[in-house]
Amino acid sequence: MLWFSGVGALAERYCRRSPGITCCVLLLLNCSGVPMSLASSFLTGSVAKCENEGEVLQIPFITDNPCIMCVCLNKEVTCKREKCPVLSRDCALAIKQRGACCEQCKGCTYEGNTYNSSFKWQSPAEPCVLRQCQEGVVTESGVRCVVHCKNPLEHLGMCCPTCPGCVFEGVQYQEGEEFQPEGSKCTKCSCTGGRTQCVREVCPILSCPQHLSHIPPGQCCPKCLGQRKVFDLPFGSCLFRSDVYDNGSSFLYDNCTACTCRDSTVVCKRKCSHPGGCDQGQEGCCEECLLRVPPEDIKVCKFGNKIFQDGEMWSSINCTICACVKGRTECRNKQCIPISSCPQGKILNRKGCCPICTEKPGVCTVFGDPHYNTFDGRTFNFQGTCQYVLTKDCSSPASPFQVLVKNDARRTRSFSWTKSVELVLGESRVSLQQHLTVRWNGSRIALPCRAPHFHIDLDGYLLKVTTKAGLEISWDGDSFVEVMAAPHLKGKLCGLCGNYNGHKRDDLIGGDGNFKFDVDDFAESWRVESNEFCNRPQRKPVPELCQGTVKVKLRAHRECQKLKSWEFQTCHSTVDYATFYRSCVTDMCECPVHKNCYCESFLAYTRACQREGIKVHWEPQQNCAATQCKHGAVYDTCGPGCIKTCDNWNEIGPCNKPCVAGCHCPANLVLHKGRCIKPVLCPQR
């Protein structure tokens, strides 16, 4: 019997052409449990036997595929497909040789040994010569020393001389301590035996073209951008930059470096790669390869308030890359790889100089009656009227942060609304309240507010809190909440927003760690224990989408119908509006007279479209923004901290309280019973 495991059409073709053999194929199933490929027919025949246990067999049409290998196992032919590993993101050159199944990150072959990319080594016979492999290129160079004193001392068995003392740039370093001089990412120094020794990092030669390289922030050496793939290179030949060199051919990389293609590896040697002085004929290379560099010969560049060493590169403003060349600063525009779209699960980030694809952050949205959409995309409704954990870090016993929401019935029979949002960061408690009012540890504050671990500011019609922990909270001052979690928090969160692990099926894990089959049980398990009485009479069930009168139903559908209008049409093909429409109708049917309850669904749909890079033409400022204060008040991010009322408007004296954000009465009006009125209209005392 001939067994196949997931080899698809090749197995089917071979079995159909071999009527005398029984093929037992292990079928692959799709997500619905339906067999793929060979599910359409049953193949019959006799058993394929073999004699030599463990022998690798060649079977036409099957083993022609380099990923499939057939062996004799228990006297029967068994075939298996090789599974290819995922290449590292740092792999800049992937190769696939003829006859091989999987792609590999290009390594190096040198003197009969094989080395992985980024590996560095030194030979005992040549301890002062450094060799390093980088995507098929071996760079051979001498250890580069940096000397900062006039009379350095050379030591037997050491590549670099040392300078007396361990005081460097005015700082006293301890024995064994390693440090970097200010402004030099490429130089490392150490304090050994009461003396200082400094070594400058030698950067590997890259196989990619120069315009496809960049220096990552905070690093010394450039790296290749993206990943190149090469198939079926001629045996022994080398790919370097955009050219292919035959085995044994040589070329000059620059005036000081000669390269040779040896057995598919480019070996590049610096001309002054050994300790000692330079010959007269190599004066042009001495600046690059001298092991001893006296201080007076070191040419540096000053750019802004920083000092850069000769040969050092850095990113400047306006997306330019600069280099220090023999004491002169040279800058050029940064070359970017054109990117127009990203694979599923990633977004195009245009914040830097070059667009890059980054993992999408997790987004949890709460809006309306309220409707919850978790980080992993599960939607549910819950009308509790207490305070609940929206999300927190569950990866450690003492959660470094948590976001709480407090719900309010707002005089409805069956529904509740989000009344306020509270962010707890260590000892700090930030409360986002109605009409975009903000309290920090109980005191109202003005905007913007910048603290060590968070920043609060008004972003258009939304209040935005950005934390160093990786959370970003948006609040509209009414009942819309959006929590954005950075990708590094994946799998660490819990609460009403779910666990952010990429699977919506396990989002209903309660506060006790057990999965809940009922949404209400799940939500109540995240209730914050307090002495406050927050229960209300038993909620009336809502069997229908809308239980109001005909007039109420007509108003609900009339307002929510705008989701289908031209203002949102550009997004319909990308983000389905049906869920938001149902939520809108539900909210409108239990909507208090003074509220525009469609706003939350419209805002949630608009934000979902914006996250997909689609601009819609709806703006909430006219009817929905919380900055549109009522009863004569106006919104101000830094309004007076002392409220003028009918009881105190004529009192003389300055206000010593700091300004606060929120709705305030204009200077010529006073607050009375929630309304701004003229002082002459105040009731007599």
Curated annotation (Swiss-Prot):
<dbReference type="InterPro" id="IPR001846">
    <property type="entry name" value="VWF_type-D"/>
</dbReference>
<dbReference type="GO" id="GO:0031012">
    <property type="term" value="C:extracellular matrix"/>
</dbReference>
<dbReference type="InterPro" id="IPR014853">
    <property type="entry name" value="VWF/SSPO/ZAN-like_Cys-rich_dom"/>
</dbReference>
<dbReference type="Pfam" id="PF01826">
    <property type="entry name" value="TIL"/>
</dbReference>
<dbReference type="GO" id="GO:0032880">
    <property type="term" value="P:regulation of protein localization"/>
</dbReference>
<feature type="domain" description="VWFD">
    <location>
        <begin position="362"/>
        <end position="535"/>
    </location>
</feature>
<keyword id="KW-0225">Disease variant</keyword>
<dbReference type="GO" id="GO:0002043">
    <property type="term" value="P:blood vessel endothelial cell proliferation involved in sprouting angiogenesis"/>
</dbReference>
<feature type="glycosylation site" description="N-linked (GlcNAc...) asparagine">
    <location>
        <position position="116"/>
    </location>
</feature>
<dbReference type="GO" id="GO:0060395">
    <property type="term" value="P:SMAD protein signal transduction"/>
</dbReference>
<feature type="domain" description="VWFC 4">
    <location>
        <begin position="238"/>
        <end position="289"/>
    </location>
</feature>
<feature type="disulfide bond">
    <location>
        <begin position="386"/>
        <end position="534"/>
    </location>
</feature>
<dbReference type="Pfam" id="PF08742">
    <property type="entry name" value="C8"/>
</dbReference>
<dbReference type="GO" id="GO:0045765">
    <property type="term" value="P:regulation of angiogenesis"/>
</dbReference>
<keyword id="KW-0964">Secreted</keyword>
<feature type="domain" description="VWFC 3">
    <location>
        <begin position="164"/>
        <end position="225"/>
    </location>
</feature>
<feature type="glycosylation site" description="N-linked (GlcNAc...) asparagine">
    <location>
        <position position="441"/>
    </location>
</feature>
<dbReference type="InterPro" id="IPR052424">
    <property type="entry name" value="Kielin_Chordin-BMP_Reg"/>
</dbReference>
<protein>
    <recommendedName>
        <fullName>BMP-binding endothelial regulator protein</fullName>
    </recommendedName>
</protein>
<dbReference type="GO" id="GO:0042118">
    <property type="term" value="P:endothelial cell activation"/>
</dbReference>
<keyword id="KW-0677">Repeat</keyword>
<dbReference type="GO" id="GO:0030514">
    <property type="term" value="P:negative regulation of BMP signaling pathway"/>
</dbReference>
<dbReference type="GO" id="GO:0001568">
    <property type="term" value="P:blood vessel development"/>
</dbReference>
<keyword id="KW-0325">Glycoprotein</keyword>
<dbReference type="GO" id="GO:0010594">
    <property type="term" value="P:regulation of endothelial cell migration"/>
</dbReference>
<dbReference type="GO" id="GO:0030509">
    <property type="term" value="P:BMP signaling pathway"/>
</dbReference>
<dbReference type="GO" id="GO:0060391">
    <property type="term" value="P:positive regulation of SMAD protein signal transduction"/>
</dbReference>
<keyword id="KW-1015">Disulfide bond</keyword>
<dbReference type="InterPro" id="IPR002919">
    <property type="entry name" value="TIL_dom"/>
</dbReference>
<dbReference type="GO" id="GO:0001657">
    <property type="term" value="P:ureteric bud development"/>
</dbReference>
<feature type="domain" description="TIL">
    <location>
        <begin position="629"/>
        <end position="682"/>
    </location>
</feature>
<comment type="subunit">
    <text>Interacts with BMP4.</text>
</comment>
<dbReference type="GO" id="GO:0048839">
    <property type="term" value="P:inner ear development"/>
</dbReference>
<dbReference type="InterPro" id="IPR036084">
    <property type="entry name" value="Ser_inhib-like_sf"/>
</dbReference>
<dbReference type="GO" id="GO:0005615">
    <property type="term" value="C:extracellular space"/>
</dbReference>
<dbReference type="InterPro" id="IPR001007">
    <property type="entry name" value="VWF_dom"/>
</dbReference>
<feature type="disulfide bond">
    <location>
        <begin position="364"/>
        <end position="497"/>
    </location>
</feature>
<feature type="glycosylation site" description="N-linked (GlcNAc...) asparagine">
    <location>
        <position position="318"/>
    </location>
</feature>
<dbReference type="Pfam" id="PF00093">
    <property type="entry name" value="VWC"/>
</dbReference>
<dbReference type="Pfam" id="PF00094">
    <property type="entry name" value="VWD"/>
</dbReference>
<feature type="glycosylation site" description="N-linked (GlcNAc...) asparagine">
    <location>
        <position position="255"/>
    </location>
</feature>
<feature type="glycosylation site" description="N-linked (GlcNAc...) asparagine">
    <location>
        <position position="247"/>
    </location>
</feature>
